Every structure is written in C-alpha cells, then in structure tokens.
C-alpha cells in the first residue's frame, strides 16, 4: 500500500519549480492526502514538445489535460463536457479537441501540436476538431488561492514562469503497483530518478500568499470608541471579497519602520464580540487589547473577518456548542463535524502589517505560535504579551482545552482550578 503524502517527504522550492517550468521542463506537483493524494506531471503548454508528451504518457495514466483560463475556453468555444458537472472535485472538463493539422491526434507529436495551439493566443475555433485526444480544463481565474487543484497549480506555475497561463498535466501511475497511482515516497524517488523538481500545492498557496498582495487598503477614517480614538483602515481581499479592518492608535504614518509595536490579530467572533457570550473570552480579549494599545499610545488591532469559530463559520460554531453541551470539548466538537480543529490562516494579517510597514510586533495573544507566520511578510514577532481574562463557570472547560490541547498560555486556568479546589 502506498504511503500518504506527508511533511516527511522532501520537497523542492517553488522558485526551483518555476525556473524549470520556464526552461521547458516538467515538474511533479502533489496535493494533500485529504484530497486526491496524488502527484501530477506538469509542464507549460506553450513549451510542449513530442518528447515531453511521450515522457508524460509513459509514466502517467495517459489522460492528458490542458488547463486554460475561462476566457481562453470561451474564445476557443470549449464548453463544459457535461451540462451538469458531477465530478467530486469540481474539475471543469471541457469538450476534447485535436489540432486540425495532426494525423491520428493520439501520437505524442499530434498531442504536442494540440497543446501548442491551445496555448497560442492567436488560435481560433477552427484550428481544432472535436472530439479529440486532449482534454482542456477550465481553471479558476485566481489559481490555487481560489481552488487547491492541480488544474490551478498548472496555470499558476506557467504564469509565474512568465509564460502563457496554460499548462499540461497528467497523474503519475505507480511503477510498484501499476493498478494505482504513485504517492508519497515513490513520487520523491521518481522525481529524483528523472531529475525533476517536486513541490506541493500547499507550498504554492503559501508562496503566493507571501509573495503577492491580495488585500488592498480602500478607506481610512477616524473611529472614536469607549477605549479611545483609533484610525480605522478598511482592507478588501481581492479574491474572496472579504473585508477586514485595522484599528490604529498613534498615527498611521508613524508605524512605518516602527519596532515592538503592540499588535492584536483578532479573529471575528460574533457571539463573543457582539453578544458578550460567556462561552469564550474573545470579546474580553479584544477590549483588553484596545485598552493596552491606548495606554501604550501606539498599536494595531487587526480584525479578521471570516474567522468565526476558528474559521469553520457561524452555524458550524453553534453546532459545535451543541456538541459541547453533549460532552465534547471545543476541539472534538469541530472534528465530529468533519471540520479541522483550526481552519484559520493569517496571511491577510501579514499583508496588512507589511502594508503598514512595521518591522517588529509585540503580539497581544495567548497563543505562542501565532507569530510564526509573520516573518515571511517581513515582520518579526519580537515579543508576546498575554491577554489574561479571568475564567468563568461557562468557559473554564473551553479554556482548559485551549491550554491542554492547543498549547495556549493560560496561567489563569490553573489559578481558577486552585481557587475552586479549596471550596
């Protein structure tokens, strides 16, 4: 049985993969074990050669696809293969095609010609016959940041290599067991044997988040609050449309180049922030952070939308509460729904801090690992300042779980337990 893909398998850098794509080579791209758990050979369609296609056919399923942007599918009149897409992964297969200059259409030479035509911005509908032996795929316009599939990875790699956004892909078959697909260590051995770079879609997602800007500052205004006056900056994510807010104390311009700035990265919590729920300490942490920042005279509150329930959404969080009422803890209540323990990611916060220009942050958080992802955005987490909120009878179990299973720094839990053990 093939081992699943995991972090123990050595991966190459995204920069190396981009360089090889630009040089006309293929790379191996793997996805998550919870998805297809497969590796695809991928190269740029505009650099297709009979030799590349023959290599791909030899080591793959042979069902070769060419991801294209939706506008190219429309330009070439490539409608969906089916009116209703029932593919479990949502892969957008279109009608199959051959270049009209080929012979049988199935040879490596003929398929390479079809790929070149599909990648050519000057090609037209009549350059192809239908049906054929090459399967175009309609990729999501925003690549792996919109859908974490090989289709989008192929488009992104070609674009990042400075080439037309059109790729070629096919799943690699196991040589150890040709009845199944290659996975994990076998993909690494295959890559090394053939001098190919191997990367993951997860790597590509993180690379794009760190090296591109998806959030834009759209508005600035003054916001007087019960805790003092802040400058409110509105940010909008250009891909998912989510709107986020940064509250600034001490002036926006003064943050550029500033060090050891108090920063609270706060995840949206309707129940805690607005309804003052006693099941969590979110609203109290937010308010205490605003007080700390006002007392310091400088600081940033980043309010991240879309983080409700550690990223699982409001209704799923309410369902998790119901499961907790039945005896599960906050972690298992998520897992019981088939949801991750914590679905949040903080690239938006990193991009906002990069936009503001601070050099280092004193993070107001009880999570000692929260600053690990900021370094990639040019911000050092120079210190962590706990935000200690005294427990109550309704949230003590929740806080114990955060301490014991999520490694949060919560000394107040021990104080509560000691005090109540004496009663």
UniProtKB/Swiss-Prot annotation:
Keyword Chloroplast (UniProt): no
Keywords: GTP-binding, Hydrolase, Lyase, Magnesium, Manganese, Metal-binding, Multifunctional enzyme, Nucleotide-binding, Riboflavin biosynthesis, Zinc
Binding site for Mg(2+) 2: 36, 150
UniProt pathway annotation: Cofactor biosynthesis; riboflavin biosynthesis; 2-hydroxy-3-oxobutyl phosphate from D-ribulose 5-phosphate: step 1/1; Cofactor biosynthesis; riboflavin biosynthesis; 5-amino-6-(D-ribitylamino)uracil from GTP: step 1/4
Ligand binding (GTP): 264-268, 285, 308-310, 330, 365, 370
Pfam families in the cross-refs: DHBP_synthase, GTP_cyclohydro2
Co-factor remark: Binds 2 divalent metal cations per subunit. Magnesium or manganese. Binds 1 zinc ion per subunit.
Residue positions of the active site: 342 (proton acceptor), 344 (nucleophile)
Protein's recorded name: Riboflavin biosynthesis protein RibBA
Lineage: Bacteria, Bacillati, Actinomycetota, Actinomycetes, Mycobacteriales
